[in-house]
C-alpha cells in the first residue's frame, strides 16, 4: 500500500492542522435521485433481501468535499439488511399457552387510591395467570407436553396451575378488574347477604344457644297467645250513633237527600224553630209567603242560612210591578252588601198553588250561562204549610239560567223545572233531570217532561240573610 505524506496547512482561525490523505480507492458519488429513491427501492425489494458481507471500512471513507454529482456510473449500492437474530431465551417450537377448558373466575381488586386493594371470591374459583420465565427452557417444554393431553388430564393440569398460581400470586400484582367484574362482585355480595337474612328470618335463633335441658331433651317451644282486638267503648266526636249504625243522612244539597231525611231532622234540640220575622212587605200587599211557610222552608235551608230569624223582601209583584228587569235590579242592589245571602222565589198561581225555588246565591242576570250549586232546590208548599223540596239529583248542573227575556230554574233534556218570561205572563213547569221534580203547578204529584203552563198571580223574592 503506497505511503502518503500529510501536507501541512495553516489557517488564521484554526491554526495548524494536517489534511487527510487522499484515498487511492475510487469513491462513488450520490445524486439527489439516489437519496430519494433508495427508500422506495428498499420497500420494493424488501421480500428478497439477501445478506451481503459488510464492505471494507477503509472503502467507506468518502471525501464529502469532492462529490461528483454528474457521474451516473457512481451510484450508491443497494442497502443490505441482515435478518434479526433470534432470542436465545425462546425456543422455536414454543407456542402460546392454550386456554384451559375449565371456566375459571378472576380475582377482583379495588384500585381506589385511598384504600388498599381488596380481593373478593366472587366466583368461588381462582384463576391462575401463568408466570412465564423465558430463561426456563425446561419449564416451557414441560408445559408443551401438558398441552397434548386430553380432557381426562385437563382437571389435573388445572389443579396444578391453581396451586402454582397460589404460590406465585404474591409475586404478581393484582390487575384492576373491569367494571363488569366489579358489578358482578357487588351483585354476588348482595345475594349472599340477602340469603343470610332470609335464613335468619325463616329460622330465627335466640342468643342463648343452650336450648336443651340437663337431660339432653329439647325444651318445648312456648307459644304466646295472640292478643284479641280491643273493643272501643268511647264515642267518636265525628259521627253519631245513628250514623255509625248505618242511618247516615246526606247533607242538604247532596245527591240522595230525600224528603224523609228532612222530616226526620232535628233543629235546636227537640223544640221548634224560633219565630221568623218577614220584613219589607207592606200591610196592603197581598202576601204569598206566610210566616208558617217560612218556618217550614227554613228547615230545608243549608245550616249557615238558618242562623238568622229575619228575612227581607227584595221584590214583590204586587209592590214593584210585573217587570223582570226590576227584579234583577233590586236584587243586584241588595246583593252588593249581602253577597252571601240566598234568595227564595215564591209564586202563587191561579189555582192557589204555591211553589218556587231556593238559590244559594243572589238571583241575577247572567246571559248564556248556568250558575248555582247543589244546595239549590225546587219546592212546593201544601195547604197545611208543609214544604216538599226537590233536591239536586247530580245528573247535571243546570241550576239557574237567568237572561233578560226569561229566567229558568232546573233544566236538562229540553225541560225546565220552572220558567217565567220577562212579564210573568207565559210561565210553565215540567219535570227536569236536574231535580227530578213533580210538576209544580199541579196539586197532585205528577211527573212529566211535557210542560204545564200556569198564570202567575203573585211573586215574591226573599233574602235569607
UniProtKB/Swiss-Prot annotation:
> Which residue ranges does UniProt annotate as crossing the membrane?
none
Q: Where is the composition biased (Polar residues)?
A: 20-32, 165-179, 205-218
Annotated segments matching region Disordered: 1-61, 73-119, 144-183, 203-223
* The keyword Protein biosynthesis is annotated on this UniProt entry: no
Choose one Gene Ontology CC annotation of this protein and give it. Answer: mitochondrion
Family (UniProt): Belongs to the OXR1 family.
Function, please? May be involved in protection from oxidative damage.
Q: What is this protein called?
A: Oxidation resistance protein 1
- The organism of origin for this protein: Cryptococcus neoformans var. neoformans serotype D (strain B-3501A) (Filobasidiella neoformans)
